[in-house]
């Protein structure tokens, strides 16, 4: 998915790095698991400081919480028939990718952080499997966020044309494209010989460092979906601003002699008559739709904001480092890597917090189990 570290072969997060030399790295001065030092030193007992224990504990809790929360969302969607439709299929696709991140990617990344000298000691085959799943799952998670944003955008701006049938077809197509594109980016090095992930001499496991693949993977996995979600939110903002202006123009001044008249209950139009009074034409259906659209727009905004904050430090670093032949301190690389992983924890929190049906389903699920 990226140039050097999405495989998790980042220098250790949970400890101050040992002495490094730029000559240890065969390419851009980055030592990926080839330098000594770290949490566990060869031939020595691991120096488990309080800081090390704290950070490792937090990372283990993050992995467990990411897995359990996304699994809860998946179980709820499977068991509640009302969720067997859009947009919950997009939510389920996101939860699947995030569960796989928690199960297949984050644990081995933590093992790599703790390994002696940050070396990959699990063999070439497992290295390729790990990196392939890393790129596949993280890319799918990112593109699923873009798919949810697109679905909300079309629902808000084209609710008449975006019928249930159209929405079902569009969501199924977006899910298929998401996983197909993610698989292409993940498997391209293996299918087309686009660089090598495993270095047996240095015991190093990392995403292919081929410059052309670096550009292809970072753009396909992050910068393209980033452009999509930013464009979508800009359009949602414009649509909301337009509707707010239209509502203000719908407020009509009434003369002082105007009398109030109650509309039929179906439309629930309310007329108020006072001196210098106004009348607002708004049906209960319009009000309900506007509230729903407002919640959807807020959810999309928070989802996009968290997505950008979690991933942009990592991908900016991975784009700039090869161009300037420079490198951040190892501790920052690890922080940016795990910040990106944490997006898989925040995703289910965000899209369930804005849907009361999920909260009710969670309560019902646990009540039945008792």
Curated annotation (Swiss-Prot):
Annotated keywords: Cell membrane, Disulfide bond, G-protein coupled receptor, Glycoprotein, Membrane, Receptor, Transducer, Transmembrane, Transmembrane helix
UniProt topological domain (Cytoplasmic) ranges: 76-88, 151-168, 234-300, 353-370
Low complexity bias locations: 20-36
Intrachain disulfide bonds: 127-205
Superkingdom, taxonomy of origin: Eukaryota
Annotated positions binding serotonin: 134
Principal subcellular localization: membrane
Recorded GO MF terms: G protein-coupled serotonin receptor activity; Gi/o-coupled serotonin receptor activity
Pfam families: 7tm_1 (PF00001)
Ranges of the Extracellular topological domain: 1-48, 116-127, 190-211, 326-327
GO biological process, one term: adenylate cyclase-inhibiting serotonin receptor signaling pathway
Signal sequence, start to end: none
Protein's cellular compartments: Cell membrane
Residue numbers spanned by region Disordered: 1-36
Positions bearing carbohydrate: 5
Tissue specificity remark: Expressed predominantly in the central nervous system; in the hippocampus, habenula, and the doral raphe.
Entry similarity comment: Belongs to the G-protein coupled receptor 1 family.
Protein function: G-protein coupled receptor for 5-hydroxytryptamine (serotonin), a biogenic hormone that functions as a neurotransmitter, a hormone and a mitogen. Also functions as a receptor for ergot alkaloid derivatives and other psychoactive substances. Ligand binding causes a conformation change that triggers signaling via guanine nucleotide-binding proteins (G proteins) and modulates the activity of downstream effectors.
Protein name: 5-hydroxytryptamine receptor 5B
The species this protein was found in: Mus musculus (Mouse)
Record lineage: Eukaryota, Metazoa, Chordata, Craniata, Vertebrata
């Amino acid at each position: 998915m990226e140039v050097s570290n999405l495989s998790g072969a980042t220098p250790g997060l949970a400890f101050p790095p040992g002495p490094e030399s730029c000559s240890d790295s065969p390419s851009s001065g980055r030592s990926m698991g080839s330098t000594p030092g770290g949490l566990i030193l060869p031939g020595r007992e691991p120096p488990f400081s309080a800081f090390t224990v704290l950070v490792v504990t937090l990372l283990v809790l993050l992995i467990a919480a990411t897995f359990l929360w996304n699994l809860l969302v998946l179980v709820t969607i499977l068991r509640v028939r009302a969720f067997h439709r859009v947009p919950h299929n997009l939510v389920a696709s996101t939860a699947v990718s995030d569960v796989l991140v928690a199960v297949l990617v984050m644990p081995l990344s933590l093992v790599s952080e703790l390994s002696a000298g940050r070396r990959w000691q699990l063999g070439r085959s497992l290295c390729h499997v790990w990196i392939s799943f890393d790129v596949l799952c993280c890319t799918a998670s990112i593109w699923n966020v873009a798919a949810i944003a697109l679905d909300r955008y079309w629902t808000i701006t084209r609710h008449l044309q975006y019928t249930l049938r159209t929405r079902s077809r569009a969501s199924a197509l977006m899910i298929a494209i998401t996983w197909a594109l993610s698989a292409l980016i993940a498997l391209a090095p293996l299918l087309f010989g686009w660089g090598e992930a495993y270095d047996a001499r240095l015991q190093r496991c990392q995403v292919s460092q081929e410059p052309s693949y670096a550009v292809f993977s970072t753009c396909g996995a992050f910068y393209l979906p980033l452009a999509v979600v930013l464009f979508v939110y800009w359009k949602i903002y414009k649509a909301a601003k337009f509707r707010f202006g239209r509502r203000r123009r719908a407020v009509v001044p009434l003369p002082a002699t105007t009398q109030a008249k109650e509309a039929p209950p179906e439309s629930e139009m309310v007329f108020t008559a006072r001196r210098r009074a106004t009348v607002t034409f708004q049906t209960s259906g319009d009000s309900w739709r506007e509230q729903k659209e407002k919640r959807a727009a807020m959810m999309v905004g928070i989802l996009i904001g968290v997505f950008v904050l979690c991933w942009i430090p990592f991908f900016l670093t991975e784009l700039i480092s090869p161009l300037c032949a420079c490198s951040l301190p190892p501790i920052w690389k690890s922080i940016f890597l795990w910040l990106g992983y944490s997006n898989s924890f925040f995703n289910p929190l965000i899209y369930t917090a804005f849907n009361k049906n999920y909260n009710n389903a969670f309560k019902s699920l646990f009540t039945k189990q008792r």
